[in-house]
Amino acid sequence: MIINRRILKSFEEISHSLEESLREVAFDSQQQLIQDVREENEELSRLQDQLQLIRSIVEKICISIKTDNIDSYCSVPFDLLYNICKDIADPSSFEDGDLQYLVSQAIFEYIILLCYYSVTNECVQGLPAVYEAEQYYKTVSDSILKSFLYCLQNSVSTIRLLSQTVLKDVNKKKLSHQKWSLKALSVDLLEKIRPRINKFMVIRNFRFVGLPKKPIEIASLVSDIPRGIVHERLDMVTQSSKYYTIKLGQLITEFDQQPEENGMFTEVHLPNYERRLKSLQDFFGLAMSDSNLLDVIRCSAKFHKDHPLRRFTKPSILTRYWPSILLCLLYGPSSVMSLWNSRYFIQDFIKTNVVDFAKGLILNWLWAPLKQVWSTVKHDEGSAISVTSQETLNSDMDSLTRMIVSFVVDNSDSTSNSPIDPILLSTKVEHGDLTEFMEIYETQLHHPIKNIATGGLVRSLLIQLQKTKVDGSMALNGIDKMLKSQQLVFGVVALSPALVILYSSIVALKRFVKLGNVWSNEKRYREQISISLNNVERVLNYSKQGADADEEHLNQGLLVIEVSNLYKLGSFLIPRSRKKEWFRDVEELVDTNLDSGAHINVVNRIYHVYGRFLIH
């Protein structure tokens, strides 16, 4: 909780101030203290024991505050505090600077701070629920259907309260030996609810202009009754939220207000005793002259036990959902039997649409593409896409080489007097150099008919046909290589849908484990943080506009509530490594030592430092 850090600091200040005061008194008048201790050994021993009890309680609370749990709250044993305070005289009854004065005042300071800890935690934890209830009732009041549903949901509790009221009246009449009857009870009950009915009818009459028709008026009356009930509850919740927010702001402002430096305080005094006690007395409406610390402890214990803010929250889950639960109880058994009779159909449906889908997704869309990609990466020729065989191309090329070499050797006498080297000629043909063959072919074309008749030109044409076949095979081989180079891309494309589905499932599972919802609450958290930051900035902008005391206390209370929401919601979104920075910066928003301009700068710092975690 945002206030707890400041309370922890106050505990440390009290302990440090007590130690310094005791050390200074012991140093200044050691001999006199020894004599006083001998004379009042029993009283000092009792005070020391009570101080140790108080400090043990304080240590437990400090340990609870220092934990990482934001909503941690350590219950305060008010009965023990009451007994301790009852046995201790007021510090003003001792001499100023006396050892008993220092110890008793330290005990009182601790007790006051423990009461403040309990009250502020109740308010800071309870007021957000009250404001949430206010928003809930506003939403319900805007709809006739929701208003009817609200009245239906609360009908059971209304009947129960009515029965308790009637029973209480009957018992009262029995105790007073008065006669009673159903008619008399009905009259008494009508007299009790008559003011509410009159108020509702007066407000309702302002809505009509002219004289509506009778059916319309009756229908309007039926629809206005539920909405009137909701509006009455809304007004009560709104007034209560404003009242307790003002009280909280006043308590925080007065409790943390620095004392005036008028030269009346000495170093042995523990600070803020009377002022802090008065702030708690004002919170509970106690007169300072007629009340003391015992009354504050009693009121704090009652405030913690009764939880007055919980009376203004929205209806409980059982109240809101008992109609649905009743329908489930009425129609649930038959629905369960119907499901049981259809269990085989449901089983087949799940197997076909869930199990087979998951199995096919893993095997066909994840495992098979992964194998294909792996085979492509390690150059597995057996799994490659093939348009033509490499062995076929090699055999065709070898055949063409032999045909050309044989043809050139057979016709070399007629074209050249130099001997032909078959090995050199084979090398030239393999590299695409067909000069010798083309020269013979050109010579044969000079006498085509003669060469056709002798068969030489026919042989040349067949070689040309073989060359065309080899060229086509080489083109297909190039296409085959291009397809092989794209095979990895095809595999990744085939794998991508399954990877997207798998990644989404893992992210949903992670969010379910972390945030408790398959569909992440991050969007809702970011929206609430944006609203809180906006409200914080508005409160800070209007805090110094010459408002009255109640308005200033209301702004202070709203600021604490909104900052508390920021403190809590931001912990869900801020990375663990930066949570300490986040807590430090948010706590500066309620630091009373900073003015409104410095607070605005803190808001701007939050925007540009943590904006990528909270807003975007």
From Swiss-Prot:
> Is this entry keyworded Signal?
no
GO aspect biological process, one term: mRNA metabolic process
**Where's it found, cell-wise?**
Mitochondrion membrane
The record, for Pfam families, names: NCA2 (PF08637)
Entry's Gene Ontology cellular component terms: mitochondrial outer membrane; mitochondrion
- Alphabetized InterPro entries for the sequence: NCA2
- Protein task: Involved in the mitochondrial expression of subunits 6 and 8 of the F0-F1 ATP synthase.
Instruction: List other remarks.
Output: Present with 2940 molecules/cell in log phase SD medium.
Q: How is this protein named in the record?
A: Nuclear control of ATPase protein 2
Origin species, per record, is Saccharomyces cerevisiae (strain ATCC 204508 / S288c)
